[in-house]
């Protein structure tokens, strides 16, 4: 079988070692004679999985003790509603920093429950998309919280600053969690869909500061209530146990490979290889200013867009999968999350060189 590298934006590739272990344990986990997906979420065996995975995540991110870690369902889109319904309290206003599609999607949902103050942060620098410095964001004084998405997967835009505010900061880290070091204590809530850097689709991680657990609207469904989920240790209803188990394997894989510091070094090296090649070429281009280029999602365009279909067709034949850009922006996009090895990025760059030589 040819070697395949999956550049899908999500669900994304998982570490090969994790998949191999899951395959080995699929029908007979821990000598029980059953799969881990078949056992009760309240069994002592699965409780151990749950406790270990939470502790490993706490270790990886250095999560302070005054934060709860919730293993939820519904994806990040469910959190677009859960955040205002959990955090507004008696307020009706919240700040939303807008740098792209996913921030805008969060705003659209939040409008059902509050009046968002939307701060458009995208600017143009030398013909490239960039993000305003956080010190220039027009945040309000009376917001319940400030929401932002540090990494916009579609445009490949990364926000490196934190909002300058004394309000709780809420971050949609679906595409950037575990890819680089963060200081969790600076956030009120962090949430992330699992299907990029954590595990398979179906699981969502929420990290929430204790003092924010008692603000929920009375109309909030219990399955989205952070306080309820914290009290029930993420088992108010049956959780996605197999996705939880796989996330636990990914956390152990990260720890065994040097943790977040090593992963950030690895990710910066991968991204540099790809961006450096694009920048020296007249055949390819990236439209994001270097200060705000994503480490995880690298969109690029061909000088001749009529060659897009041929590029994607030949790339697929070469084992370079899922490179088609999002329908909103077109072109190509290479998503190079934690599980993508440097070898995969180097293979993509080599293919790009050969394609350019043939079609320039």
Swiss-Prot record:
Keyword Iron-sulfur: no
Binding site for pyridoxal 5'-phosphate: 76-77, 102, 153, 172, 195, 237-238
Main location: cytoplasm
Sequence positions bearing N6-(pyridoxal phosphate)lysine: 196
Binding site for L-glutamate: 42
EC number from the UniProt entry: 2.6.1.52
Pathway the protein acts in: Amino-acid biosynthesis; L-serine biosynthesis; L-serine from 3-phospho-D-glycerate: step 2/3; Cofactor biosynthesis; pyridoxine 5'-phosphate biosynthesis; pyridoxine 5'-phosphate from D-erythrose 4-phosphate: step 3/5
Protein name: Phosphoserine aminotransferase
Organism in which the protein naturally occurs: Aliivibrio fischeri (strain MJ11)
Lineage: Bacteria, Pseudomonadati, Pseudomonadota, Gammaproteobacteria, Vibrionales
Gene assigned in the entry: serC
């Amino acid at each position: 079988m040819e070697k395949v590298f999956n550049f899908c934006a999500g669900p994304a590739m998982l570490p090969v070692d994790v998949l191999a272990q899951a395959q080995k344990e699929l029908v007979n986990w821990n000598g029980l004679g059953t799969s881990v997906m078949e056992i009760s979420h309240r069994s002592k065996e699965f409780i151990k999985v749950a406790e270990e995975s939470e502790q490993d995540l706490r270790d990886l991110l250095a999560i302070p003790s005054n934060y709860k870690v919730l293993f939820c369902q519904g994806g990040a889109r469910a959190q677009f509603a859960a955040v205002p319904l959990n955090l507004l309290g008696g307020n009706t206003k919240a700040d939303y920093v807008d740098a792209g599609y996913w921030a805008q999607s969060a705003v659209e949902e939040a409008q059902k429950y509050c009046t968002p103050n939307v701060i458009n942060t995208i600017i143009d620098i030398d013909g490239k998309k960039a993000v305003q410095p956080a010190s220039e964001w027009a945040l309000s004084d009376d917001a319940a919280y400030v929401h932002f998405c540090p990494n916009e997967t579609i445009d490949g835009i990364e926000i490196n600053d934190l909002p300058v505010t004394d309000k709780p900061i809420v971050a949609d880290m679906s595409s950037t969690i575990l890819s680089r070091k963060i200081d969790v204590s600076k956030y009120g809530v962090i949430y992330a869909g699992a299907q990029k850097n954590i595990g398979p689709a179906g699981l969502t991680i929420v990290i929430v500061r204790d003092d924010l657990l008692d603000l929920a609207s009375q109309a909030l469904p219990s399955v989205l209530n952070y306080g309820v989920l914290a009290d029930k240790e993420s088992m108010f209803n049956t959780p996605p146990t197999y996705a939880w188990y796989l996330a636990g394997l990914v956390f152990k894989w990260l720890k065994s490979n040097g943790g977040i510091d090593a992963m950030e070094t690895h990710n910066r090296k991968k991204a540099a290889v790809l961006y450096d090649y694009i920048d020296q070429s007249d055949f390819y281009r990236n439209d994001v200013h270097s200060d705000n280029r994503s480490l995880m999602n690298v969109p690029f365009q061909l000088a001749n867009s009529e060659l897009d279909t041929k590029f994607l067709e030949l790339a697929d034949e070469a084992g370079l999968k899922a490179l088609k850009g999002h329908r909103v922006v077109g072109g190509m996009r290479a998503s190079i999350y934690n599980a993508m090895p440097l070898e995969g990025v180097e293979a993509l760059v080599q293919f790009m060189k050969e394609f350019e030589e043939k079609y320039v």
